[in-house]
Amino acid sequence: MQAGKAFIQGYAHASGRSLNIVPLALHQSAAAVICACNEELTLGQVLAQLKRLPLKDIVVVLNGTTDNSLTQVLEQPGVTLVYEPDRAGHDVGRALGAKLTEADTLLFVDGDMVVPAEQLAPFLYAVDRGDDVALNNLSSLLPPFARQDEVSRIKAYLNRVLNRSDLGSNSMTAVPHALSRNMIQIVKPEALAVPPKAQSLAIQHGLKVTAPSQVDVIRSNRLRSTNMGSGNEVARLIIGDHLEALAAWLEMGGNLSQAHLLSRAEVAYRRNAR
């Protein structure tokens, strides 16, 4: 990508034109899905960054929006809009968006987080090169186990039950992440409405799930009344989604007694970690 950027800079300098794009060479087609609700302050910036990437489609799902977000999207050329006036489920927009593009790689972002295109590119690249699920790697941003919240712990628990403890607390719950068309066809678009369940299905089907790059969405996450404080609405939703994923895993023949869970020594070590 550095060589491509140097070429573009040289061309722009010689031609006197501004080419503010990310020179990402993809073998397959790619698209992005943005889920948003009342994000008029950031949605335009999110779209601007996505338009710097080689995407065939950009799908915006406005879910229960009451601000000026709809007008902003309607003014954007080349954007597919899904407008749901009533508030649907928290992650239903992902399932809707995935049905509206035939791209080989789908990048999922939220309308309240402005992530530079350069930081989004690694997720597209990973799937283009063979990964089925490319997660945001937040491992180094989390505190020691003893100081982690209940959401981080249940994410790690699900991964460990699925024999993917190497993924830590990394989850499709967090954005950005990218998925392959193969993954979506196998787990079905509807499963994306419950991200942990979709991730569990991908792992159970032997798909390639990785966490290739890090975007710090912890500090940049927009604070709302629904995501602040212990046991907040969003935390309860995420925990419920993980319990649904565990239930689905058990229905498919999973056995908690045979899962690779923490030993007493490991639990003590993590509890006492500082």
Predicted segments with their positions:
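C-terminal catalytic/acceptor-binding lobe
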Residues: 4, 8, 204-274
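N-proximal low-complexity "stem/linker" segments adjacent to membrane-targeting elements
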Residues: 1-48
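Conserved donor-nucleotide/metal-binding helix-loop-beta segment in metal-dependent transferases, i.e.
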Residues: 118-142
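Short aromatic/hydrophobic "clamp" motif used to bind/position activated sugar donors
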Residues: 106
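Short, acidic, metal-binding catalytic loop of nucleotide-sugar glycosyltransferases
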Residues: 48-56
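Glycine-rich, basic loop-to-helix element that forms the pyrophosphate-binding segment
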Residues: 87-101
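A conserved acidic beta->alpha catalytic loop
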Residues: 62-70
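Short, flexible, basic/aromatic active-site loop/helix in glycosyltransferases
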Residues: 135-140, 150-170
